[in-house]
Amino acid sequence: MLLDQGFLLLRPLVVEQGSSILFCCLLADRSCDIAEVFASQEIIRHTQRNWKSRNVFKPCIVGQMSETTVTLPGEKSRRQHVSGLSFLIQVSRPGLWSTTAMFYLMPLGHADFLRSGRLWLGLFFVLFPLGMLLYGVNDIVDTEGDLLNPRKGTFLFGSRGARGQLAALRWQIAFVQIPFLAAFYFLVGPRILWWYATLLLAVGLYNAPRFGWKGRSPFDVLIQASYLLVFVLSSWLNRSPQLPCQAFVFGVLFAMHSHVFGEVMDIEPDRLSGRSTTATLIGRVPAKLFIAGLLTIETALVYFYFRDWIIAGFLAIGALWFVLDAGVLWKNRPYSPVEMRLFLWGWNIAALLGIFWNWSHGTLTRLNLFSGLQQ
């Protein structure tokens, strides 16, 4: 048999080292020809088992046999496409979609979701194209820092792109804005140009390489007021009244405490990358107490100006939680990756409940003052 002929080509060589004897095998000149005959991996594995059973010969193939997977060109293209799409979705921060949707839907109150094409157009825009612009530029600028961040590379916390993906991202961000800019110009009018100009200014101020506000406290927190542009776009696009100024203040404070919470989770990678944020400057415990203070002000706003006991109660519970976090629970200890994921899932559940409550009651769309405040 051909397999037996292969064995005849092997001759043992015994090498003594101390008390151990190493058994090696040398192939004769025809070994390459025999190896080509043994193209089937199953035959090679069968040969290895026969060699081992004789306890004299050791296979001439050193190391573990590698598994070879043949990928068809069409399948490879599909995999690359799926991988690229997953990366773009991660860039848009699905972990923050519920919060962004809550901001977009807040001015609309009890809107008719089923019959409003404008509503769905704007909702898709703020979740994906706007998310790509806001966070994609940040990912391009923070390439080195994201490599040190264990949160990155997930759908919850954002992307960690390869060099080629990040190089193409800037053009993908610009390309995806074009159809929406045209649609909004048709639906909203020339004022959408001012909206986009303000948005680009905020993105530029935050991410500029030398003087970017993302590394300059307290501007890294104050720039979060730009999220109010979502309120403005929603009202324009859906022909709804703008929210009361107290609701705008609430939105600013909410965006600020959300951002500081993200900075608290990123203290270690930010310090390693040399990035200075409000959380890295004041420390983990003071940052948590700062979040609690912002939530307390939000609670007072909702309680006194909108008289919504449910929203005010949730905000008060959040303020109490961060006080306990800073003083009793975690204190100065960093969150683990599992804890951060649980926190963000809880955050999303709370945001979804807020969306439902706003759709049911719409209390933040109109003032409902106490008699003393009305006077």
What is the predicted role of each segment?
Residues 90-109, 224:
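The first (N-terminal) embedded transmembrane alpha-helix
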Residues 101-105, 221-236, 280-284, 341-355:
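Small-residue-rich segments of transmembrane alpha-helices in multi-pass membrane proteins
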Residues 127-155, 255-279:
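Acidic (Asp/Glu-rich) catalytic motifs at the cytosolic membrane interface
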Residues 143-192, 196, 276-309:
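Multi-pass membrane catalytic core of lipid/isoprenoid biosynthesis enzymes
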